[in-house]
A protein has these predicted regions:
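N-terminal export/membrane-targeting signals
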Residues: 3-21
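Bacterial Sec-dependent N-terminal signal peptides
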Residues: 15-44
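Short acidic, Pro/Gly- and aromatic-enriched capping/linker segments at domain boundaries
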Residues: 43-56
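Extracellular glycoside hydrolase catalytic/binding regions
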Residues: 49, 74, 81, 86-102, ...
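Short polybasic amphipathic segments
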Residues: 55-59, 408
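A short, well-structured catalytic beta-strand-centered motif of the EAL phosphodiesterase domain
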Residues: 67-73
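Aromatic-lined substrate-binding rim segments of carbohydrate-active enzymes
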Residues: 90-192, 205-207, 254-264, 357-392
Length: 443
């Protein structure tokens, strides 16, 4: 009896073992093997912090860094009404509108990352900071010229709206850009009026903007990734006595820099020049003082002695390149001792159609949709020659739509050059250049 019981228990043991092990060609296989832990999802690559050493942007490993990207502005009109309009879907510059804007720019940043962009110039667009109340007048606009108009008019600026939309829009845009591998250069709301002088109302306006901005914890925590461009396109700037003075630029912007530093922001600050950001001669003798200082420059066709008409592409292109480099050095001597970023530049060739007069009263031939008219094989090669010669010039094209076809991106996620890939326009040229520069950056 005991023997039978033993055999029975033995058989039960075999049957039980067969429920966990399967024999296949003599190999015991566990039908419920332990699953290996899933591969961890890699964390997004963290941008190295940047600082200034001499005339270079430098990362923590001492590598010299040059950045390439675009500027853009969170504005329904300038974004082609792609994320809303007051007429079609009741979109306004409020918190609900901010969410739509953020969703739109998430798609834009995805495309810019694919286009090998490493920097984004963010405009704190006044559409958000201006108060919609018709009766509201910003007290700080006292002293503004009666004919101030457009984005040079600060009479509707509301500091409380700036603070609010820094929290709900602007800094969220900056964070999104950084998560897509781009450093962020922040420009103040609007543009400078035509005439400035040390101690004027507009200097105080900029002081207020940057005081509020540089107190933000997020900004100070990301001082190696977010930088400040102090003003957009000063034209004429005089001293406190309204006289020409080589120290006027320094005296206008140095107090603003000092306020930013007093608030604890240690990151890079980009100072502008006069002449719509084309003249930096006075900074050679009176530079902005302190650490992490660079200069923000603009470059368009016809500036710095270079245009399609002046370039001898067929007979002596090297001489044309040398002239561009010489004229740029003459106007922007700071490139010898500080990093420079060209925060506005674009070009496209003449295209049959109607031209127009720009805001300076200059006639502009019809082109593919850029501010200035020129071609890559003439003006463009001289522009790039200057970038490569200097070595310490970063750049942002004047808009996302100057680099990539935004509508195509939104349609199917593909990233193709703007203007149908026209080889003489900045979109195709810069997509090629950015890929080249990106490869060097990663190697």
């Amino acid at each position: 009896m005991k023997q039978r019981l033993f055999i029975f228990i033995f058989l039960i043991g075999i049957m039980t073992s067969c429920t966990t092990d399967v024999v296949d060609n003599g190999i015991i296989i566990d039908p419920n093997p332990e699953k290996p832990d899933p591969e961890p999802v890699p964390e997004p690559e963290i941008l190295p912090s940047l600082h200034v050493e001499g005339k270079w942007l430098v990362d923590p490993q001492g590598n010299q860094v040059v950045l390439h990207g675009v500027m853009d502005t969170p504005n329904m009109y300038f974004n082609g009404w792609r994320w809303g309009s007051p007429w079609t879907n009741n979109t306004n510059y409020n918190d609900a509108g901010a969410k739509k804007c953020l969703d739109y720019f998430e798609k834009i940043f995805t495309g810019l990352e694919k286009a090998k962009c490493t920097v984004f110039r963010l405009h704190l667009d006044p559409a958000w900071t201006n108060d919609p109340d018709n009766s509201y007048v910003y007290a700080g606009s006292a002293g503004q010229a009666a004919d101030a108009s457009g984005e040079a008019d600060i009479s509707k600026f509301n500091p409380e709206r700036l603070t609010h939309f820094l929290d709900t829009l602007y800094l969220n845009l900056a964070e999104k850009a950084m998560k897509h591998g781009m450093y962020v250069v922040v420009r103040p709301p609007g543009v400078c009026p035509g005439n400035l002088k040390v101690g004027d109302y507009y200097q105080q306006y900029l002081m207020t903007v940057w005081d509020i901005f540089s107190q933000q914890s997020f900004v100070k925590e990301h001082a190696g990734h977010i930088s400040i461009e102090l003003a957009n396109e000063p034209v004429n700037l005089k001293n406190a006595q309204n006289k020409e003075d080589t120290k006027a630029l320094h005296d206008y912007f140095q107090p603003i820099v000092d306020k930013i530093r007093a608030n604890g922001f240690t990151g890079i600050i980009w100072a502008p020049g006069t002449g719509w950001q084309s003249n930096y001669k006075s900074y050679k003798t009176h530079p902005i003082e302190g650490d992490n200082i660079g200069y923000a420059v603009h470059d368009y066709t016809g500036w710095y002695g270079c245009s399609d008409e002046s370039v001898d592409r067929d007979n002596n292109i090297e001489k044309s390149k040398e002239k561009k480099i010489k004229e740029f050095y003459n106007s922007v001597p700071v490139v010898d001792f500080a990093p420079v970023i060209i925060t506005e530049v674009d070009w496209s060739p003449v295209k049959p159609g109607e031209g127009h007069y720009n805001e300076h009263g200059d006639w502009v031939e019809s082109n593919y949709g850029t501010w200035s008219t020129g071609s890559t094989s003439k003006w463009g090669v001289c522009y790039k020659a200057n970038l490569d010669h200097c070595g310490n010039i970063s750049m942002t094209l004047s808009g996302t739509s100057c680099l990539i076809d935004v509508d195509q991106l939104l349609k199917d996620g593909s990233v193709v050059p703007a203007f149908g890939g026209e080889p003489e326009a900045c979109g195709k040229a810069c997509m090629d250049w950015y890929e080249e520069y990106y490869g060097k950056l990663k190697n």
